Amino acid sequence: NPSENSYGNDQSYNSNISVDIMKKYTEALNYLLGSNKHKAVLDDMTIVFWAMEPEETCEDLFSQLIWSQADQMNAEDTEAMLKKLVEDANAGYLTEQRLASMEEIHPDVDFYMLGLKPNSSRLSVKFLIRRKYADVLWNIARFQRELQITREVKPVYLSWIKKELISPKSKNDKVNPALMARQFEAMIYGCDYPNALLETMVRRVRIDSGRKKMNDVRIGVIKACLNRKNVGEEIKVALDKENTNQAYLCGRLFAILERLQQEASNYSLNRTVKDAYFASASTRPLLVFPKLINLANQSYLKKAQYPMFYNKLIGEVMVKLNGGFPDHFSLKEQGEFIVGYYQQNQAFYEKKNQEDREDERYGTGK
């Protein structure tokens, strides 16, 4: 069509970008793609990032907090830095003094993130984000704070999250690229995580078996998704005995009943109530819990070494449940059940570890 051929130019020569500019941006992109300081790969999407300043400190910290691939920071430096950032996120702000102390980082520097995906013979741009570095760092600190599930602050990397979205038995290590892109944007912008992230992680916990069923990363992601949606009802880092959420309480109760069963059998069981009932208890509690309570009263409590301790724990939770169980749990409530279960279990392990340390200290251990 002659009307589309401006000044007699056609195809790529009929463009609002000159050949000179094309060569320059191609050279710049190739430099970014060739530098590990400016690039990270998330499945089949490549993310390049850069700050509008000559020093590469911003990129280094960004890489270390999300991908663990910085040149200038080791694991100890990262954990120390993350602890300070999480403290600021807990307080609800990120101080300029903190940024100023971070190796001469300037909070007003423009920071760019570009998501690229190969598409046939071309590159497809998934996103282009430009933000002040202080805003980026604040949202990463918030992201890391929400993922913490123990009092010991440790960084959680995107590659770890991606791994936990996949069944350990699966030979396919691919995750929906749209899900990973939306998760990345939620981290950078501070908006809600995609519903598919919570749905996938809850499904993995319910369906998978063995030790890989639950871990800090999976439970941390579930907690993070819930807390961004539950305005004014935040799930804490560790066990919260004051939490009266019905699903959270049912999760705690399930952990107590499982622990009671294990103690009643002197920890000799290869299969516990978790293996038999966890999936159904987290979705249809009314169908499962009356049966488990009867088992506890008729068998487990009679054989346990400390029946009064468990009877007291069960009673404390049952009082807050008003003696009844919901008929079913929504996806959100299934997540709350899982976190309640995990945190109650962690509290048991922490108590056991503390007792073991005291036995060693006073020479009373076996």
Protein language model regions, located:
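Extended alpha-helical scaffolding segments
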Residues: 1-366
